Amino acid sequence: MPLPLQPMPEPLIKPLADAAPGENPVHVAANLQTFLALDFGLKRTGFAVGNRLLRTAQPQGTIAAEGDARFVKIALQLKEWQPDALVVGVPFHPDGAAHENTLRARRFARQLQGRFKLPVFEVDERYTTTEALGRGARDADAMAACIILEQFLRSI
């Protein structure tokens, strides 16, 4: 059943697609140094870790779970990596329009923030899976999360 389209509250971060070229769309506090990025999918969620100082990210794997089981597995990754903040890829149509998965990813971002009490930043993830496959990724979801995090790190 399609999700009803409702006005969204102010996003946790202005998606990069809304920023002018060269514009820093958000202020990220200097104490936020390590990040865990998530490429949300209905059945699989890729994740990557990175740090601000080196502006590098590394794919780490994919969580194949839904609902509460997904959050249990994310909690394990948070315990292992201890990031200062999370970055969530939010999909849009090529023209920048939102669709059902945009709403799902934003809901996922809000759930992460509510459950784990960490800052959560949204990043436009258009074409990240295509780029991941183009890089020859064996785990396209984890590589897409890595690309999302690389984009975020370049923007701050």
From Swiss-Prot:
Its EC number is 3.1.-.-. It comes from the Bacteria. It is found in: Cytoplasm. Belongs to the YqgF nuclease family. It comes from Albidiferax ferrireducens (strain ATCC BAA-621 / DSM 15236 / T118) (Rhodoferax ferrireducens). PANTHER family: POLYNUCLEOTIDYL TRANSFERASE, RIBONUCLEASE H-LIKE SUPERFAMILY PROTEIN. This is Putative pre-16S rRNA nuclease. Keywords: Cytoplasm, Hydrolase, Nuclease, Ribosome biogenesis. One of its GO terms (molecular function) is nuclease activity. Its main location: cytoplasm. One of its GO terms (biological process) is rRNA 5'-end processing. The lineage of its organism: Bacteria, Pseudomonadati, Pseudomonadota, Betaproteobacteria, Burkholderiales. It holds the Pfam family RuvX. Could be a nuclease involved in processing of the 5'-end of pre-16S rRNA. GO terms for cellular component: cytosol.
